[in-house]
Amino acid sequence: MKNIATGDVLERIRRLAPSHVTAPFKTVAEWREWQLSEGQKRCEEINRQNRQLRVEKILNRSGIQPLHRKCSFSNYQVQNEGQRYALSQAKSIADELMTGCTNFAFSGKPGTGKNHLAAAIGNRLLKDGQTVIVVTVADVMSALHASYDDGQSGEKFLRELCEVDLLVLDEIGIQRETKNEQVVLHQIVDRRTASMRSVGMLTNLNYEAMKTLLGERIMDRMTMNGGRWVNFNWESWRPNVVQPGIAK
């Protein structure tokens, strides 16, 4: 193996590199520092991918459902000012999540585009190499119960769920509203906000009903780091949506 400390390898790199390319290092010390930095970046990327895959394996599906994998801001249809505002808020949320942490809740009737914009946020983050899970509360509870059946405590699943970069909890308020479900939601929001990881919520409930369901403490935590509540106050748009290959 060539000894880079002799300087021969560095000189060879300089000769072989295109004239318009500047090497990120000029000395042996800089080369070693560059290698360490690149190695750390790669390790972080692998760890993120592993976290995503572990949660997906437990849920037995990918982070974003096939129906929403092509959702983006550009193909979100705007027909009124409310939708225009929701789109603007979703874009702003995505911008903040690219470099930091924020929370959000989308509230409205079924079919009003909550999942589309949440998936658009998630898809943008996935392209940036971040980890994203959009999951219903019912699926969270099913995965927990399955872990109990396997003789596990469910702690491993909760820990993995709380380590992805963005977790979006869907269909809050549709569940049976048992004490166990409330405790699980509290644990998830508590852990994620305490570790500065973002939480999204999708619900048919209004703000007061959500506060009654989850409690004032959790709703207050959702306002951390500029958290937003966005209302989707219009009728379902699903009758106007046609999936490729499906006749309307």
Curated annotation (Swiss-Prot):
Keyword match Signal: no
Any one GO molecular function term: ATP binding
InterPro entries: DNAC/IstB-like, IstB_ATP-bd, P-loop_NTPase
UniProt entry tagged with the keyword Coiled coil: yes
SUPFAM superfamilies reported in the protein's UniProt record: P-loop containing nucleoside triphosphate hydrolases (SSF52540)
Domain of life assignment: Bacteria
An example Gene Ontology biological process: DNA replication
Positions in coiled-coil regions: 33-57
Keywords for this protein: Coiled coil
Pfam families xrefs: IstB_IS21
Entry-linked Gene3D superfamilies: P-loop containing nucleotide triphosphate hydrolases
Name of this protein: Uncharacterized protein YdaV
Organism: Escherichia coli (strain K12)
